[in-house]
């Protein structure tokens, strides 16, 4: 196992409901990547954008070689095939690790899943299968999964997928909420890359903003 290597997999919603947040999403993602390029240790990045289908724009690319995402890659459209995106990514990364030499397997693997709506278009995977896959990777290999959801009950949805409450958070699907997401995720990645246990406080800024502004709206 390669101690200073971290596998980071981003599964990002680009379905039609994300319309209007393209610039915020692109800017937040790029700022996070630039910050992580300066962090110690090695990291491989995979980025899957999903709507009706999944598109892989980075497949285990050295983080220092990641070029800024643009609106050519992140253009919103279609429905929300979330389960297909998660299941396909787990299957791919799991196979890579399975057949890699011991010294090529990352010490840490983190999936970051962001969606702003309900699953409504998957055909290859269902929630039971995805839950089984996530629980297997967590228990056997220590993989971590973060779930950030807007316009849904993110904590309850994450539970259906085998992701614990302390790894799930509700956020506001707007400019402020999107920025906080990427800032918090970057801190979580830094913690994981350093080998420190991930604190449940990783989501505190997102949660505080969500509760404050939800109260204002109510």
Positions of the model-derived regions?
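Acidic, low-complexity intrinsically disordered regions
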Residues: 1-218
């Amino acid at each position: 196992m390669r101690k200073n290597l971290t596998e980071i997999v981003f599964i990002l919603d680009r379905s039609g409901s994300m319309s209007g947040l393209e610039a915020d999403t692109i800017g937040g993602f790029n700022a996070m990547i630039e910050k992580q390029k300066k962090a110690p240790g090695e990291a491989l990045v995979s980025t899957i954008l999903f709507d009706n289908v999944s598109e892989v724009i980075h497949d285990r690319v050295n983080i220092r070689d990641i070029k800024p995402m643009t609106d050519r890659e992140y253009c919103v459209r279609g429905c929300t095939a979330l389960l297909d995106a998660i299941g396909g990514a787990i299957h791919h990364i799991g196979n890579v690790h399975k057949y890699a030499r011991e010294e090529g397997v990352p010490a840490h693997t983190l999936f970051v899943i962001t969606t702003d709506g309900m699953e409504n278009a998957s055909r290859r995977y269902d929630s039971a299968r995805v839950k089984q896959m996530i629980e297997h990777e967590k228990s056997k290999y220590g993989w971590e999964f973060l779930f950030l959801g807007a316009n849904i009950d993110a904590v309850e949805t994450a539970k259906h997928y085998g992701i614990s409450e302390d790894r799930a958070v509700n956020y506001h699907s707007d400019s402020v909420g999107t920025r906080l997401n990427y800032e918090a995720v970057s801190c979580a990645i830094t913690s994981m890359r350093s080998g420190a246990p991930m604190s449940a406080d990783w989501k505190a800024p997102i949660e505080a903003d969500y509760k404050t502004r939800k109260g204002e709206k109510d």
